[in-house]
């Protein structure tokens, strides 16, 4: 059973809100146990929620003022594509990223990043 587009959009927003609040538990709750993270058309960077969690635990520790601002979002089928402006808050230049979230049910099963 697939969720309506609006529900996927709401889940994507909830994980982004948790990311910006640096609430690791709330952020990770939106991802599947076997989540895959990869560069767009590139190598898989990490697999599984424990690896995902460890990665973002480090990001939150290293960049306590990190924020991602949503510039645009589209929903296509079971995919939510976010265009974000990311500012690490550490004096480094902000950057833009496209995050492509692929859903299985109400969980994000895969994330592909284009940067």
Where are these regions (language model features)?
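A beta-strand edge to alpha-helix "cap/lid" segment located at domain peripheries
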Residues: 2-4, 20, 38, 43-44, ...
């Amino acid at each position: 059973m697939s969720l309506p587009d609006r529900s996927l959009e709401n889940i994507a927003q909830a994980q982004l809100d948790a990311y910006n609040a640096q609430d690791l538990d709330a952020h990770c709750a939106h991802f599947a146990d076997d989540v895959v993270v990869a560069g767009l058309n590139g190598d898989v960077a990490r697999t599984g929620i424990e690896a995902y969690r460890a990665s973002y635990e480090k990001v939150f520790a290293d960049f306590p003022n990190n924020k991602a601002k949503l510039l645009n979002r589209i929903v296509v089928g079971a995919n939510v594509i976010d265009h974000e402006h990311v500012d690490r808050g550490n004096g480094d230049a902000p950057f833009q990223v496209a995050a492509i979230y692929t859903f299985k049910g109400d969980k994000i099963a895969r994330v592909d990043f284009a940067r």
